[in-house]
Curated annotation (Swiss-Prot):
Highest expression in liver and to a lesser extent in heart and brain. Low levels in lung, tonsils, salivary gland, trachea, prostate gland, adrenal gland and thyroid gland. Secreted into the urine and blood. Expressed by hepatocytes. Keywords: Antibiotic, Antimicrobial, Cleavage on pair of basic residues, Disease variant, Disulfide bond, Fungicide, Hormone, Secreted, Signal. GO terms for molecular function: hormone activity; transporter regulator activity. This is Hepcidin. Induction: Expression in hepatocytes is induced by LPS stimulus and the induction is mediated by IL6. Expression is inhibited in presence of TNF. It comes from Homo sapiens (Human). GO terms for cellular component: extracellular region; extracellular space. GO terms for biological process: defense response to bacterium; defense response to fungus; immune response; intracellular iron ion homeostasis; killing of cells of another organism; multicellular organismal-level iron ion homeostasis; negative regulation of intestinal absorption; negative regulation of iron export across plasma membrane.
Length: 84
């Protein structure tokens, strides 16, 4: 019984090895196609993020200057100090 389980494990290992070797021969063609598309995708992604970064930059002016909250207002830890 132990011999049959060893044979089964060896066959499974051989099958996995063959599967990994055959999948490696398929991927180089596909990875070459993906490499050709990446520069265009990066440019499109950067263009789509730029308006969001510009909006964030405008909103940053609304953050309070005083980061430390002294607890002078009703909302504790709000980040805005009423005394300054």
């Amino acid at each position: 019984m132990a011999l049959s389980s060893q044979i089964w494990a060896a066959c499974l290992l051989l099958l996995l090895l063959l599967a990994s070797l055959t999948s490696g021969s398929v991927f180089p063609q596909q990875t070459g196609q993906l490499a050709e598309l990446q520069p265009q995708d990066r440019a499109g992604a950067r263009a789509s993020w730029m308006p969001m970064f510009q909006r964030r930059r405008r909103r940053d002016t609304h953050f309070p200057i005083c980061i430390f909250c002294c607890g002078c207002c009703h909302r504790s830890k709000c980040g805005m100090c009423c005394k300054t």
